[in-house]
Amino acid sequence: FKQSDENSQLIRQFLSELNSGKLSSGLLKISSLSKLASFLDCERFAIYDSRAIFSLNWLLFKYTNADLFFQPQGRNRELEIRNMNVLFHFSDIKPNYRKPDVSFHQYCGLLQYLAKQVYGEQAKPYRIEMLLFGIATTWICADMDQLIKFDCLRNQDFQTA
C-alpha cells in the first residue's frame, strides 16, 4: 500500500468489517486487502486474486450451476483476451453472480472446503488458491480455447472496457 489517508481509512474499514461476514462495496477492488486478511489468519482467509477467481469461475461455470464470484480487475493479457463477461454478453449464457458484500467470505469458505477435500483435513485454503492461480493461464486458458476461438484477438491491441 502507498501511505495515504485514503488507504489507511480503507484498511481500518476492511479490518473492522472482516469478521462480520460482509464487506462494504469497493473493498475488494484492492486485492492487497484480501492479502492482509490472509496474512492475519490463513486458516480462514485466502487472497481474492484475479487469476484464482478466473479459474474458479470457469470451473464453476463449466461443471456446476453455482453462482460465480465477482471478477477483480487483473493485468494478465491472456485472461483479458478471454474475458468471461464478454463471452456471456455475446451468448445466451446469463450466469448469476454472488452478492459483492458476501463474495469474499463465500470464496474463503469454498476454498476452505475444497482444500480439505483435495489435500486433507489440515489443509489451508491458500493451497487451493495457489492451485487456481497456477492453472489460470495454462489449463483454464487451454480449456477455454478448446471450446471458443480467441485466436483472432491474440495479435491485436485488445483492451477491455
Tell me what each language-model feature is.
Residues 50-54, 63-161:
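C-terminal accessory module of base-excision DNA glycosylases/AP lyases that mediates lesion recognition
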